[in-house]
Curated annotation (Swiss-Prot):
Keywords attached to this entry: Monooxygenase, Oxidoreductase
Known role: Dehydratase; part of the gene cluster that mediates the biosynthesis of ustilaginoidins, dimeric gamma-naphthopyrones isolated from different fungal species. The first step in the biosynthesis of ustilaginoidins is the production of gamma-naphthopyrone precursor YWA1 by the non-reducing polyketide synthase ustP, via condensation of one acetyl-CoA starter unit with 6 malonyl-CoA units. YWA1 is then probably substrate of the ustZ to yield norrubrofusarin via a dehydration reaction.
UniProt feature coiled coil, ranges: none
Family the entry assigns: Belongs to the tpcK family.
Source lineage: Eukaryota, Fungi, Dikarya, Ascomycota, Pezizomycotina
Protein name as annotated: Dehydratase ustZ
Cross-referenced InterPro entries: Dimeric_a/b-barrel, EthD_dom
Domain EthD: 18-113
Originating organism: Ustilaginoidea virens
Pathway per the UniProt entry: Secondary metabolite biosynthesis
GO terms assigned for molecular function: monooxygenase activity
Catalysis: reaction(s): naphtopyrone YWA1 = norrubrofusarin + H2O + H(+)
EC number of this enzyme: 1.-.-.-
Length: 140
């Protein structure tokens, strides 16, 4: 059983809805969807919420990193990372009427929810603002 100090991290490996450009997808997620959900995340005790989006430049950037270990580029359009202290935070947020009526249905406007994948696990911050962290303190 996990200690109460461990943080959970949900990674959503997302695909955009067909017909939406990468630029429009990122703009919608950052400027429309994120503001809808961020207040609920605060209300239910979430700690971090970040997004990274692939762009038109992503293939050329990956080419610069390519070698035997960096050969398999993922086809996802984004990665959303959400950190929270307990699964109840997420369960309670999803049960909130505002989530059910507004946030949940909003996903269908921009995301290919049938293809997107998720992974949950323990959050281990190892480098923050260019400084190494005590990785053991995050896992105690």
């Amino acid at each position: 059983m996990a200690s109460h100090h461990q943080l959970l991290c949900l990674n959503i490996l997302g695909f955009r809805k067909p017909g939406i450009s990468t630029e429009d997808y990122r703009n919608y997620m950052v400027n429309v969807h994120a503001p809808l959900v961020a207040g609920l995340m605060e209300k239910y005790g979430f700690l971090h919420f970040t997004m990274s989006h692939a762009s038109e430049q992503s293939p050329q950037l990956m080419d610069q990193l390519y070698d035997a270990q960096f050969a398999n580029t993922a086809s996802y359009d984004c990665c959303v990372q959400i950190v929270f202290p307990s699964i109840e935070c997420f369960v309670n947020m999803k049960a909130d009427p505002y989530f059910k009526q507004t946030v949940g249905p909003d996903h269908e406007k921009f995301a290919d929810t049938k293809r997107s994948q998720m992974m949950i696990g323990w959050f281990s911050p190892l480098l923050i603002n260019g400084q190494q962290t005590d990785s053991l303190s995050a896992a105690e």
